[in-house]
Amino acid sequence: METADLSPPEATRENDDSGSMRGGVATLNIASHTPEADDTESLSGASTRTLVSSELPTLVPMAPMRPDLLHKEQFALVFGGVKTQSYSDPAAKGPGSHTIRSLAWNPTGQLIATGSADRTLRIWNPDRPNFRYSTDLRGHTGAIEKVLFSPVRDAELASCSADGTVRFWDVRSKTCVSRLDVGGEAFTMSWSADGSTMVVGKKDDTLIPISVKYPSAPTTHPDGIKALNLPSSTPGATTYTALDPHPQSVQTNATTFPWCMPTPEHPEQHIFVTTGEGKVKIMEYPSFDVVHTLNAHTSACLSIALAPTGRYLAVGGSDALISLWDTTDWICRRTLSSENGGAIRGVSWSFDGRFVVGACDELGCSGNGLEIFHAESGDSIYTIPTAGHNAGVSAVAWHPSRYWLAYSTTTDGPGSSNSGGLKIVGAAGGGL
């Protein structure tokens, strides 16, 4: 591994010479504070995120934080003794028959969803690897491109497919509660922090907003702080409505929302959109007006993820690099790369925002394994051995509150016994 110390690309501001972005969002800081090097101890024991613009501190429920955070120097020693649990899906009939395209944990980390090219959509209990304890959700007629749990409802799942539909599921009742036809191949989704908005991306470079209206219930922070009204867990009465599409003039890939809760006083939202030009556009929602542009990579930007601390925005590119952007000033602090790297089609952060990993599904790009990087230094600190020397990694997802890392591999060639499938480092008695 080498950390490419490139000169930070310039960030483009839209018609504003004052150093601030237009639209009244100041510098769009989404971190609640500016950590010094590896300063994440304040997360210990926390049960909420306060990851918002500097003008708008609000509460976002999440899984409880672990009190024992791993430091860079400890990581390799701890992970070296951790086992990897495999989850075998009966839908896998042989090498390459069951490539998982997408992974997603629910907010509490008690469930993980897998969406596959063979149309299999399955919900797993990470503590019980046997498929008999999993749930098979059926209905899609094309490859499943993306799965995503609601950030505010632990049993609500969304999936999008090449069949041109977006489906919403209640995983407790194993039913599809809504089906929306988006008129073309859908391949990416992102959900706003309050669960009220989803944006779906199609392969024709059209973004489609979806309004999600829940029955609301007041939510109180464990310390007695009254938070926003969040959706009730009671099923029913939720409506899903596809709004007017927003065609984009350039190739549009992954999207993500910040961890910012809109309020009646500050209803504005923003969304990050990666493009085939190597840029990341920060857009106002729901207008989709561009307020800021990051010149992130020399080729297409394919994946994007905001650190749970709000400190960094990670962008994966087809140039085999992951760039880390400081959200306090929108400067690229460092780039990460692997010796055998390929196009980075997925990127994920550990719950404490210290460690980041990328997914490359090209055969051979994983080399000797899956590399984990320390965000603050850019160092490669541990490599997880993956099945098959030539296997690619199609998807990665850190657990929302533990040092468990879920990933899936692609087939590693004709005659191989490796048929991909879900693997979780640390789960089911694995040691973390």
Please tell me what each predicted stretch does.
Residues E2-S102, L228-N229, G236:
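Intrinsically disordered, low-complexity acidic/Ser/Thr/Pro-rich linker and tail segments
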Residues Y87-I100, L137-I144, L180-A186, P231-P235, ...:
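WD40/WD-repeat beta-propeller blade N-cap
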Residues H98-R101, D118-R122, G142-E145, D163-R167, ...:
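Short coil/turn segments within WD40 beta-propeller repeats
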Residues L103-G109, L148-D154, S190-S196, T256-Q269, ...:
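Loop/turn segments within WD40 beta-propeller blades
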Residues I112-S116, L157-S161, V199-G201, I271-T275, ...:
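Conserved beta-strand element within WD40/beta-propeller blades
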Residues P126-P129, V171-K174, V212-P215, Y285-F288, ...:
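Short loop/turn segments that connect beta-strands within beta-propeller blades
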Residues V393-L432:
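Blade-level signature of beta-propeller repeat domains, shared across WD40, Kelch, NHL, RCC1
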